[in-house]
Swiss-Prot record:
<feature type="active site" description="Charge relay system">
    <location>
        <position position="67"/>
    </location>
</feature>
<dbReference type="InterPro" id="IPR009003">
    <property type="entry name" value="Peptidase_S1_PA"/>
</dbReference>
<keyword id="KW-1199">Hemostasis impairing toxin</keyword>
<keyword id="KW-0732">Signal</keyword>
<keyword id="KW-0378">Hydrolase</keyword>
<feature type="signal peptide">
    <location>
        <begin position="1"/>
        <end position="18"/>
    </location>
</feature>
<dbReference type="InterPro" id="IPR043504">
    <property type="entry name" value="Peptidase_S1_PA_chymotrypsin"/>
</dbReference>
<feature type="disulfide bond">
    <location>
        <begin position="31"/>
        <end position="165"/>
    </location>
</feature>
<feature type="disulfide bond">
    <location>
        <begin position="144"/>
        <end position="214"/>
    </location>
</feature>
<keyword id="KW-1204">Blood coagulation cascade activating toxin</keyword>
<dbReference type="GO" id="GO:0004252">
    <property type="term" value="F:serine-type endopeptidase activity"/>
</dbReference>
<keyword id="KW-0720">Serine protease</keyword>
<dbReference type="GO" id="GO:0030141">
    <property type="term" value="C:secretory granule"/>
</dbReference>
<dbReference type="GO" id="GO:0006508">
    <property type="term" value="P:proteolysis"/>
</dbReference>
<feature type="disulfide bond">
    <location>
        <begin position="204"/>
        <end position="229"/>
    </location>
</feature>
<feature type="glycosylation site" description="N-linked (GlcNAc...) asparagine">
    <location>
        <position position="105"/>
    </location>
</feature>
<comment type="subunit">
    <text>Monomer.</text>
</comment>
Length: 262
């Protein structure tokens, strides 16, 4: 019964962030149009609603969160304003999707990562360019950049037309573990913890899958957090990109049987 209760609580917290998949960065400002050439938007093919973000890591591959998986979606690149398109915007659909286990087996602290191969390569342009994978792991205390088209109010369904950006801090993992004792999060994890302890700045619904950029390097993928967002002493968790480098690079090289770190 205890296990069932824990699993139920984990599902609730997973859903709370997945449901935030249409929210924007809270406490931020409009991103400079030239600072997010790698940022992609995942759209529902039927409703045309933006539900997640992602990061272009080369001309043919996008990295996002596993919980952003949907049956039918499109990937828009080179987008800034949802209402006023850039001339160099491009749209792709997934050709292949790769998960550490499967889209249904990720956990709050592990394997919330999805690697997408596009149906055709994109070309670099004024508003499109990939972001390199990290060369070293991040350090606690680093200043990190978050961005996305997610909700800009922690409690209201307020969505921006353009992506918002904010700076937050990389924190000790325990700062994400301590606020949620009921979830039994492990003592160590392949996730990063980032936020502002006094609250006010955070990723939120719709920012899932987007990048966490620390000291200029792509270090994390927005995974989960509290709802309402941006609450004091409740930072958010990000899948640690550096720990998955071997898996990512193996898949891109053609070794589709590669396994994620244990």
């Amino acid at each position: 019964m205890v296990l069932i209760s824990v699993l139920a609580n984990l599902l609730i917290l997973q859903l709370s962030y997945a449901q935030k998949s249409s929210e924007l960065v809270i406490g931020g400002d409009e991103c400079n149009i030239n600072e997010h050439r790698f940022l992609v938007a995942l759209y529902n093919s039927r409703s045309r609603t933006l539900f997640c973000g992602g990061t272009l890591i080369n001309q043919e591959w996008v990295l996002t969160a596993a919980h952003c998986e949907r049956k039918n979606f499109r990937i828009k690149l080179g987008i800034h304003s949802k209402k006023v398109p850039n001339e160099d915007e491009q749209t792709r659909v997934p050709k292949e999707k790769f998960f550490c286990l499967s889209s249904k087996n990720y956990t709050l602290w592990d394997k919330d990562i999805m690697l997408i191969r596009l149906d055709s390569p994109v070309s670099n342009s004024e508003h499109i360019a990939p972001l390199s994978l990290p060369s070293s792991p991040p350090s606690v205390g680093s200043v990190c950049r978050i961005m996305g088209w997610g909700r800009i109010s922690p409690t209201k369904e307020t969505y921006p037309d353009v992506p918002h950006c904010a700076n937050i801090n990389l924190l000790e993992y325990e700062m994400c573990r301590a606020p949620y004792p009921e979830f039994g999060l492990p003592a160590t994890s392949r996730t990063l913890c980032a936020g502002i302890l006094e609250g006010g700045k955070d990723t939120c619904r719709g920012d899932s899958g987007g990048p966490l950029i620390c000291n200029g390097q792509f270090q994390g993928i927005a995974s989960w957090g509290d709802d309402p967002c941006a609450q004091p002493h409740k930072p958010a968790a990000y899948t640690k990109v550096f720990d998955h480098l071997d898996w990512i690079q193996s898949i891109i090289a053609g070794n589709t049987d590669a396994s994620c770190p244990p």
